[in-house]
Amino acid sequence: MKKAICALLSLFLLFGTLTLPALAAQDGEGTGTLPVSGEPEPPTDEPPTEDAAPDFAVLPFDDETTLIRPWRSELSGEWVLFLPAGADLTALTVETGADALLLGGTELHGGDKTDLLQPDAVLPLQIGERELTLRVLASENLPSVFISTESGSLDYIHADKSHKEKGRITTVENGEVTLSDAELKQIKGRGNSTWNYEKKPYNIKFDKKTGLLGMEKAKKWSLLASYVDQSLLRNPLATYLSNAMGLYFTPDYRWADLYVNGEYQGNYLIYESVEVGETRVDIHDLAADNEEANPDVDDLEDLPQVGTGPDGAVEDGYVFGSRKWIDIPNDPATIDGGYLLELEYRNRYPDELSGFVSKRGQCVVLKAPECASEWEVAYISSFYNEAEEALYAPDGRNSLGRHYSEYFDLPSLARMYILEEYAAEYDCGISSNYFYKDADSGLLVASPIWDFDIAFGRTDVVYDDMWLRDPAIWFANMRFERSGANGVTVVQPTVFNLVYRSAEFRQLVRETWQSYRELFAPANLTAEIDAMAGRIEASAVMDAIRWDLHRTTASDTTRAKVREQIGAVRSYVTGRTPALNRGFSENAALLYYEPNGAVGFMSHNAISAIGDAVTLYGDSRGKTIRLKAPEAGLSLLGWCEDPNGDGPVYAPGDRLTLQRQVTTLYAIWGVAPAVVEHTALLGDVDRDGQISAADARLALRAAVGLEVFAEKTDAPRFLLADLDGDKTITASDARLILRAAVGLDDLEGKTVTFTEPETPDEPENPENPENPSDPENPSDPENPSDPENPNDPENPSDPENPSDPENPSDPENPENPENPENPENPENPSDPEKPENPENPVEPTADQEG
């Protein structure tokens, strides 16, 4: 065994990338020509370059397929050996093609066992004349997965995501080999934006159903790289919440350290793929029905792809209402399910085999059956379009009279919305959102979850400083996609954006959120995060060093950085839960995005929400909402760009065209006036009780822009002038009013009922203290017409008011000059007993006597 491994290792090092399984395949056990470019260079006598792999490897387990070799850090120049968890660190087998090597000053030969390779050790390594530095890191707690490609390299697979290659796989759990050198039918790239990163995600497929790391047997598995999520926790946290909330068919997963062709690739999430199957999305398998109905077709994927374009072509681009399918000769007996649908970005949609673009512009991919027939795509697209029409309708009903609740399973939709909103998952409602429709079911069920690495306060590297880090934002209920068709750009609101406008759905969300308050409690989630973090920390440190995430190979420094990433997730959930407790309260504010323009819609007279202002982003980044809770009894009167309310105030429901990339609006609070209901004749624009030419003139002025009848702020005139009910005042409306005024048309006494704020001159308002015309208002101190108001000191008409010093009609007023009994009145000429009165003509003065 020792000599065989040493000989193979020498060849491995000469050719640079060939692994043991690859060499075995070329020795008669292979499967054909390897998909590699060119031939390996012949060996030379030149000394190895600085970055050439050293003649050194380690066998951590008693299985030759687990042989691993060190990786060179370009940053430090060190060679780093990443050891899997469960290896016996006191007796690791060293392999080398050299006669001997010096490790930490100890001479070792191929096949020797050593205890020198301890975690965090930094050792000198000398092989012949090469003097190297070897840093040792070791994982803990996690299983390890060893994959070898048929070519012995990842170059062909990395050249294009569609490239496939055969391989073999070994798994180790708790130090025990649980799957040894099993055949892989294929390994290939996967993902969308994640495929563009240095650390690649992969899909693997077995020939037969195989269990991995204790999970249920299946053929397909996904290896997620989590490159943008340096905490490595976000997908697992979403999975934990999904399972706890009872979302259907939540994919299972395991963390694992992945080695490919002997080189450490990092910490990966081995996830169950999203597909129809007994152990996955367990609904009726319509794809199997298609195969059974077409026994003469070896592979349905080889049949032509057809579309609704001219002559059956698949439309080149993004066309509303278009469909595409596979030209399958025979349909099954029934085609009502099961369907697994994925909402997708428009730029990714062309790569899919079967799908449709809804009449409103939503791209929908058929994940099952992937090879769908024309009638299958027609059936499910018609069903989805009806559901979408109901979502767009103000009353939630489509033109068939069917409510959106007749198309969607609302409990699952509410749970999925809450999870997407809580996580502020970047693709929510646009991509990686799945719905399934089973056979004999009339509902789309929101499940399963997928792809939460850009969530929980984490953004894509490109948008690293975006507002998504803020835990006090609305996101899922405002998400949209900007789309283009035939030179026209539209804004496509998501299913969550649309359904959250429904008061019934919001109430269901509030009730559902309340039922999971303990699950989302910060104490519960931070405890779960800490448990996850403790399990993967050693592996996370290795992963960060392997991919130079923190520009260091020092484990202590890297560990501190990893903990910072964990802390960011903890901080997010700590702030997110109380924010949504407010956001999902009975009187929370709502801001949603209206399609076909950069228009923010504020609705609901709200009195509490998530912060202190609302920020609207004029580009595709989305919208946020923050409202400061006012004092008790106040209502939201509108929004203003000035925090003090100076300037235009936009009423809830008004359209606001964003003039800049970012606009901040402040909530204006106050006591809302009482509202009264009025009824007027349709066409009586000036509300004088009759339809006349003056009404037609007002409507015409509005039609040509000389008058402005705002639908929200001038509702009465708008409603009375809009005779054809198209929510626009046109010359046609003015003409209809004029015809009615001159008797050519009869409006049959049609009326319009509307509400208006109660005004201070309303004569029937007994509570109005400023109403001078209300004779029955006893509490109005300024009402001069109330003769019975004893509290009015300025009321000259009250003869019984003894407290009025200027009342000339009060005979008991001591200052009344007409009061003959007033001895204190110095100007009273009629007082005969007042000798001090110089003007008293009756009583002579003292000077006049004598």
Question: What residues fall within each predicted segment?
Answer:
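Conserved oxyanion/phosphate-binding beta-strand-loop segments in alpha/beta enzyme cores
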Residues: 165-225, 372-379
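Cellulosome-associated attachment modules in secreted, modular CAZymes
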Residues: 4-5, 16-25, 671-776, 780-782, ...
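Low-complexity, acidic Ser/Thr/Pro-rich repeat tracts that form intrinsically disordered stalk/linker regions
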Residues: 20-66, 673-676, 757-764, 797-798, ...
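Predominantly extracytoplasmic/ectodomain segments of secreted and cell-surface proteins
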Residues: 32, 38, 48-118, 130-136
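Internal "kinase-insert"/substrate-recognition segments embedded within catalytic cores
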Residues: 208-211, 225, 246-251, 263-418
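Middle-to-C-terminal accessory/interaction subdomains
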Residues: 349, 362-430, 435-590
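Serine/threonine-rich, repeat-prone extracellular segments and beta-strand-based repeat modules
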Residues: 99-125, 642-666
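Secondary-structure capping and domain/repeat boundary segments
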Residues: 65-79, 586-681
